[in-house]
């Protein structure tokens, strides 16, 4: 059975009720992982995990817990890359699938934009 991991640090508030309804309807075991309290709602299918505020601590926790075939919702492109390396699936909060075919392009664009911002 698939497990869902939500990178809660940047998950949009407007989508939380929609996500919770889907979790309830599909009865998907879900972990919401963040470095602060994030609440998408109460459900017997949802477990909240608060990690230290160290850089990438939530990401590291997600990667450590996930198994092949699991699904991660994240806007964090480096995390999506790590998820794909573990043969799991990653989508952003709009439902855009990160894949082996497109993740390196997303990473390159992210890195380019970061270097432009730092200039």
Language model features: what each stretch is:
Residues 2-119:
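Nuclease catalytic cores that cleave nucleic-acid phosphodiester bonds
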């Amino acid at each position: 059975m698939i497990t869902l991991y939500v990178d809660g640090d940047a998950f949009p508030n407007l989508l939380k009720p929609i996500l919770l309804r889907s979790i309830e309807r599909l009865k998907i075991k879900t972990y919401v992982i963040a470095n602060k309290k994030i609440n998408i709602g109460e459900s017997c299918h949802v477990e909240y995990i608060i990690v230290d505020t160290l850089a990438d601590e939530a990401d590291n926790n997600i990667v450590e817990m996930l198994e092949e075939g699991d699904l991660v919702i994240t806007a964090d492109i480096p995390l999506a890359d790590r998820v794909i390396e573990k043969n799991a699936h990653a989508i952003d909060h709009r439902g855009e699938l990160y894949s082996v075919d497109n993740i390196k392009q997303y990473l390159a664009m992210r890195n380019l934009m970061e270097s432009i911002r730092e200039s």
